[in-house]
Amino acid sequence: KEKVVKSVKAADSLSVEISKLKKKGINQKKNIKCHVLAYKMVDGKKVTVAKSITIHAAGKKNKSVTDAKSIKLKKTSYVLAKGKKAVVKASIVKKNKKRPIINHISEFRYATSDSKVAVVSKNGKITAKGKGSCSIYVYATNGCAQKIKVVVK
């Protein structure tokens, strides 16, 4: 079961800063893992309608690892024929160049906006499925993301 840390209504800001868990300050020397759930009320009960990716972020005072500052992509768009493949080439720009990125999960995670047009593997291999266009999202461990446009002819 999910632990609710903070509820935000649609009219509120799109960003939220959480500084305490269970009335205690967050230890900034440790890594943080979290995700966001969006829900709506149906017959007086909360029904989850969306879930963000889970992020793994280094605490601000962590001296052993760092987070991604941004993601650099070799290409930001691909035009493919149905059935053809392409591989995403990406690199991370670190906040602190001397420290490694959190490495207990893969360096990059991928998602597609429309799996009928193109799918992407956990290794970043894009496969064109059907005619149309979609976006492929490349996520770093801390949720930093870049978007790639894919057109399938």
Predicted regions and their residues:
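Extracytoplasmic soluble-region selector
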Residues: K61-K153
